């Protein structure tokens, strides 16, 4: 059961990370200039 739970959490975190990364990358409010911190 621990293996299954670990696998599920890994998949969930993976998809959430992809979603957040894609959302931030496609956010029109961000300036295209990479020098902005």
Curated annotation (Swiss-Prot):
It is found in: Plastid membrane. GO terms for biological process: photosynthesis. GO terms for cellular component: photosystem II reaction center; plastid membrane; thylakoid membrane. It is a single-pass membrane protein. Its main location: plastid. Keywords: Membrane, Photosynthesis, Photosystem II, Plastid, Reaction center, Transmembrane, Transmembrane helix. PANTHER family: PHOTOSYSTEM II REACTION CENTER PROTEIN I. PSII is composed of 1 copy each of membrane proteins PsbA, PsbB, PsbC, PsbD, PsbE, PsbF, PsbH, PsbI, PsbJ, PsbK, PsbL, PsbM, PsbT, PsbX, PsbY, PsbZ, Psb30/Ycf12, at least 3 peripheral proteins of the oxygen-evolving complex and a large number of cofactors. It forms dimeric complexes. This is Photosystem II reaction center protein I. It comes from Cuscuta gronovii.
